[in-house]
UniProtKB/Swiss-Prot annotation:
Major location category of this protein: cytoplasm
Function: Major role in the synthesis of nucleoside triphosphates other than ATP. The ATP gamma phosphate is transferred to the NDP beta phosphate via a ping-pong mechanism, using a phosphorylated active-site intermediate.
The species this protein was found in: Frankia casuarinae (strain DSM 45818 / CECT 9043 / HFP020203 / CcI3)
Enzyme category, top tier: transferase
Subcellular compartments: Cytoplasm
UniProt entry keywords in alphabetical sequence: ATP-binding, Cytoplasm, Kinase, Magnesium, Metal-binding, Nucleotide metabolism, Nucleotide-binding, Phosphoprotein, Transferase
Subunit structure: Homotetramer.
Short name of any one Pfam family annotated for the protein: NDK
One GO BP: CTP biosynthetic process
Active site location: H117 (pros-phosphohistidine intermediate)
Name listed for the protein in its UniProt record: Nucleoside diphosphate kinase
Gene that this polypeptide is encoded by: ndk
Length: 137
C-alpha cells in the first residue's frame, strides 16, 4: 500500500487548551508517522492563501483572524491512507455533529473554533504541505 502525507494544524484554540499532545498521540496511535512539526504564529498572507477557497464567503475574515490569533502547531503525518485516517480522527467540521471519540466530538463545541484542521484530499495535502513546509516533498 502506498504511503501518503497529510497536513494537520492544531489551531490556536487547541494549543491554548493544551491539546497538542492529545492530537499528536491519537495520530501516532493510529499508526501515522510525524515527518515535520512546527509551533508558529501564522502570517496573515499564509492564512489567506491556505483558506483561499473561502475568500468569497462571509466568514472568511473571522476565519483568518482566528487562525492568526495565536500560535498553532503545523505538522505533516504520513502513512497508508493518511488523509482519510486523520479525517476520521478529527471528526466532522461541526463539532456538535462530530462522532463521540473524534477530536472535535470530544473537545470542541463551535464550528469557528474546532481545534484541528486536516487536509481533505491527497491533492489538498500536497498544496498545503508545500505552503507550510516548502521543500519537504
Amino acid at each position: 500500500m502506498s504511503v501518503e502525507r497529510t497536513l494537520i494544524l492544531v489551531k490556536p484554540d487547541g494549543v491554548s487548551r493544551g491539546l497538542v499532545g492529545e492530537v499528536v498521540g491519537r495520530l501516532e496511535r493510529k499508526g501515522l508517522t510525524l515527518v515535520a512539526l512546527e509551533l508558529r504564529t501564522l502570517e496573515r498572507s499564509v492564512a489567506e492563501t491556505h483558506y483561499g477557497e473561502h475568500a468569497s464567503k462571509p466568514f472568511f475574515g473571522e476565519l483568518v483572524d482566528f487562525i492568526t490569533s495565536g500560535p498553532l502547531v503545523a505538522l505533516v503525518a504520513e502513512g497508508p491512507r493518511a488523509v482519510e485516517a486523520s479525517r476520521g480522527l478529527i471528526g466532522a467540521t461541526d463539532p456538535v455533529k462530530a462522532a463521540p471519540g473524534s477530536l472535535r466530538g470530544d473537545y470542541a463545541l463551535e464550528i469557528g473554533q474546532n481545534l484541528v484542521h486536516g487536509s481533505d484530499s491527497p491533492e489538498s495535502a500536497k498544496r498545503e504541505i508545500d505552503l507550510f513546509f516548502p521543500g519537504l516533498s
